[in-house]
Amino acid sequence: MKSTLMTASLLILVLLSIVDYASVYAELIDSEISMERHWINACFNICMKISSDQKYCKSFCG
């Protein structure tokens, strides 16, 4: 009985650490996507000020 309880406790700790790691990783991915969008918007805005060609700026900035 005691070993079953210890095994269950260990399993819960492992699962909690996996969930914690996954949430941190998801936040990292989300922040990278946000930074990429910010970069694309900034690139597009500067390109539009220079060339005023929307089609060119979309292809240039991604």
UniProtKB/Swiss-Prot annotation:
Query: One cellular component GO annotation, for this chain's record?
Result: extracellular region
What are the coiled-coil residue ranges?
A: none
Q: Which molecular-function annotations from GO does this UniProt entry contain? A: potassium channel regulator activity; toxin activity
Residue positions assigned to the propeptide? 27-36
Which terms are listed as keywords in the entry? Disulfide bond, Ion channel impairing toxin, Neurotoxin, Potassium channel impairing toxin, Secreted, Signal, Toxin, Voltage-gated potassium channel impairing toxin
Major localization class: secreted
Task: Specify the signal sequence span.
Answer: 1-26
Q: Which cysteines are joined by disulfide bonds?
A: 43-61, 47-57
Q: In which tissues is it expressed?
A: Expressed by the venom gland.
Q: What does this protein do?
A: Potassium channel inhibitor (Kv).
**What is the protein's name according to its record?**
Potassium channel toxin kappa-KTx 3.2
Q: Which organism is it from?
A: Heterometrus petersii
